[in-house]
């Protein structure tokens, strides 16, 4: 059994129901939300457990932690209202059900034991997710291994592949491109990473895809259709409220509890539709602007000197990681002797109007556009390799010397660098530290600081702990490392310097 608790604001009952309803999305018209359909709560859970219990006071969840069981229950607590929702794949499989309407719920445990679960949500609001009937592998062991005290790892992990594929803690650290929340795993804080702050020689390239105009037009058409649908729903809810008021005009409905509740529900339905109409119209206006002037994609590239075996393209969708360390052709070639583009990490945040993620957030729907994106990243990565000129005039030996200076003495590319103080200091002196404040959650860039290099970043690091007094205090704006912006032209390349936004 796996438990996940969120101590933030809780879900209202209606929102909680929509969270566990298949095919339902409240985020489609909100471009700022992470992911088009959320973070993969339902699809991730069904790939991992048989039951899920969800106790909520409000919930943020990563599907990376949910692909482990078939069942869950969600408990929510907010404004004195306790809600418990169950989703069971076991039940569906047992009776070969394609769809089911739950009219009543049979709780196998006593109510005292059930309400004890809500006590685990210590604050006034929050959410508790309980996964059980965890999946097992062929040997009978659980798919997830809980032997490590502060981590959850795959039981059949592969030593030579990236740590983020084996470790939930490592995966959560890069799950969001710009994390602004606190995540704890097994009682210990996850030190989230703003990946652009961990790379050497970060370069930024703007790319306008051939299909970007077409995608923008399609997105605008979808938004227009949504506006029409919402207007029709608003007309229907307004009509229902008008009919109610006409029917009971002249009567004192305030003395009738049933009529009062019906009136409130009808008024709320109209109010909700008015809010959705405003939201849809704003989204349509934004889509119109994007249609007339499509925003180019932004590619970032850098060298991962801390872990050179973790390289490839990190593909995000609205700030949420979809695929990691995807090797493009220039990195797949048998170029171990040339070492061309090995150790290079590419980062792109793709809006769903261009590429929609699958429901489990592990891939993209349109394979043709996906492959087109990878080809573009491959071309830009080759240009990046030329721009940084890592080898200099020495060729492959120059690349080998570069890596040797940072402690990579082994010719085996999958091996880690030496942890000798001399080389560790070199790596941190070139990059510094990008740290998130434990209070305000802003990100700070700290130049090389010996205690952090030797002892690591304190778990509860705050802005007041900044070695540079200029940046002490949560009121200070975020200070991020610089990035080289490469402006392409048919005849020349311009490189400028700007801080990462």
Task: Name the predicted role of every residue range.
Residues 39-40, 59-60, 334, 448:
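Short beta-alpha junctions and helix-cap segments that line functional grooves
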Residues 187-204, 215-501:
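Conserved GHKL (Bergerat-fold) ATPase module
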Residues 37-39, 345:
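Short glycine-rich loop/turn motifs that provide flexible caps or phosphate-binding loops at active sites
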Residues 1-35, 49-62, 67-317, 321-323, ...:
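Interdomain "switch/hinge" adjacent to the Bergerat
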Residues 44-46, 81, 453-455:
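Short glycine/serine/proline-enriched coil/turn segments at secondary-structure junctions
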Residues 41, 91, 95, 359, ...:
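Solvent-exposed, flexible loop/coil residues
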Residues 40, 44, 64:
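Short alpha-helical Gxxx[C/S/T] motif in the catalytic ATP-binding
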